[in-house]
Amino acid sequence: MDDRSLKLAEDFVSARYIEAGRESLRATARIMRSILAQRCCPDEGLTDAAIELILRQLSLMDTNNLAHHVGGGEREGRVVSALVRMRHFHLTHGIGRSGDLFSEQPKAAGSSLLYKITNVLMLDLIRQAGAPSTAAAVVVPMATGMTLALVLRCVAKTHMKELMKEAEAVQLQRTVTKDSTSATSAAPVQEPPMSEADRDRHDRTSLPVPATPRYVIWPRIDQKTALKCIDAAGLVPVPVQLRPAVPLARSAAPCVSTNRDSLDRGQDSIGSPSTPTSSSSLFLECHVDDVAAAVNAVGGPSQVVCVLSTTSCFAPRLPDNTVAIAQYCKKAGIPYVVNNAYGVQSRRIMTRLDAAQRLGRVDFVVQSGDKNFLVPVGGSIICSGDKERCKAVAALYAGRASMSPIVDLFITALSLGRRGMQTLWSDRYKCRARLIRQLRVFARERREVLLVDDSDDDKADEDTVGGSQRTSNAVVPRNDISVAVTMRAYGLPAAEASSSGAQLGSEQAGRVTNWAAARALGAQLFRSAVTGPRVITPAPSTPTTIAGCTFRNYGMHQDREPPCPLLVIACGIGMSESEVDALMARLRDLWPVPA
């Protein structure tokens, strides 16, 4: 209602009550005006009624909701089910036009505006998460894997154009050099006369045409989507094997091991003050030297479409060192794409991505909508430090796109606001600290090892390492989302478990461990309504082939046989402290302390 309508309403209801209603309407209008002007998420979340009012107003701007609309085409926003119309707030036209997500629809001004607003809301929240160098964000109504495939096709297309421009520049330089040499020659060689058509044909055939790059350098992560998106894009993955991670330097503290030999100790050391409850040395990471070696192995940067690395991952893998890889890609002239599936919730990951964008080359960063913003599966956010790159990938999308994931993110961003998202991020670190404290006791009681980043043993502060403040140049990739517990003797009789202690870590350790019992624990957890934790068992004799690549011990991120199965648990955004307590209670019931 406008001011004129409200003034007339005073003839029906007391003016002081109408004035209170006017102020409520103005408050919502001010927030919407602020979003449009400042292009950022509001600090405080809006009520559901206010958000629904905004959605209704936007939907009324679409032609299918005009009072006297007459449609004479094949796609006029017609929806036969009233329930479906309500589910979509009458926003039925989708987004994009003629194969470009950013194109405005003449029939859907409200939907087009909502999409543009959602993009700036996501950009603002991603900047707030720790990546202020991000210049643009585009929401794509596909899950992470297919969005990565779209990005890879865009990178391949753009990179080929760059190589062609370089080849043309080389040819131009050769022509200039040849003309200069001919002009200064004392006895120029008389060339036979050529027709215009022959000369044009000669110029085209002499242009060096670069080979089409088709390789994607991919640090190994045992997650099928990461490989299948490369295959779906018609490219060839080149896996880079991981190495054992270098332990973090940390202050002296009891009950913490930084040596792989912690798995080789006998029973006498178990339960003593030096009992290992954490071990960084069992983590795995990618070295930038191995990335460079993989590039050289396929023929150099001209044969490589991009490097595709991963930030968010399951233990014992660590996030890739995005800063080092970005610096290498900038030096080598190779595009760099980051799979940041659920990394927005990690302050560490986001600050390193920001540093990578500032110090090196990062073409695209792709993150999931559901894993980071707690919405239904179906949407992803593509980010870049270059607005033109985001425009290019949006223009590559074929056809129109679904509105559902965009509406979900729009509602969630307005409902939470900046402070609401910050609270969710802070609560995750509190839950993580609570989970680690309980898992530490759990592992010690069962004579197992908790695999967790050493610097996080007793602190939830993501900006400290080993009890000291992190310096700006200390860019060390670490996993602050996922942890793991060893299952060295799970399912073994007490006597056998005790006698096998001296052999733990050797090649025989995996053979004496009851892997079938370990796998059964994962099934029991699922039947107990506990989802998320997974049991990973070594499989040295059962190779797994995905997209033409064969792996051993798939799920453990390494070909060499790990010493034992692992119980992997992630503390993701939205997890509550009550869930942590319930998880640990059911885990204790299914995995009791050995007698």
Curated annotation (Swiss-Prot):
Binding-site residues, pyridoxal 5'-phosphate: R75
> Where is the region Disordered?
174-208, 257-278
State the superkingdom: Eukaryota
Instruction: Name the InterPro entries on file.
Output: PyrdxlP-dep_Trfase (IPR015424), PyrdxlP-dep_Trfase_major (IPR015421), Sec-tRNA_Se_transferase (IPR019872), SepSecS/SepCysS (IPR008829)
Spell out the GO cellular component terms annotated for this protein, sorted alphabetically and separated by semicolons: cytoplasm
Chain positions of site May act as a substrate filter by repelling compounds with a negatively charged alpha-carboxylate: E74
Q: Which Gene3D superfamilies did the record assign?
A: Type I PLP-dependent aspartate aminotransferase-like (Major domain)
> Pfam families attached here?
SepSecS (PF05889)
Q: Where is this region: Phosphate loop (P-loop)?
A: 96-106
The processes (GO biological process) annotated in the record are: conversion of seryl-tRNAsec to selenocys-tRNAsec; selenocysteine incorporation
Q: What happens when the gene is disrupted?
A: Impaired selenocysteine incorporation into proteins, such as SelT, SelK and SelTryp. No defect in promastigote growth rate and in their capacity to infect host macrophages.
Q: Where does tRNA bind?
A: R358
UniProt EC number:
2.9.1.2
- Which cysteines are cross-linked by disulfides? none
User: From start to end residue, where is composition biased (Basic and acidic residues)?
Assistant: 196-205
Top enzyme class, one word, equals: transferase
Q: Which family does it belong to?
A: Belongs to the SepSecS family.
Q: How does it assemble?
A: Homotetramer composed of two homodimers.
Q: Under which name does UniProt file this protein?
A: O-phosphoseryl-tRNA(Sec) selenium transferase
- Protein's organism: Leishmania donovani
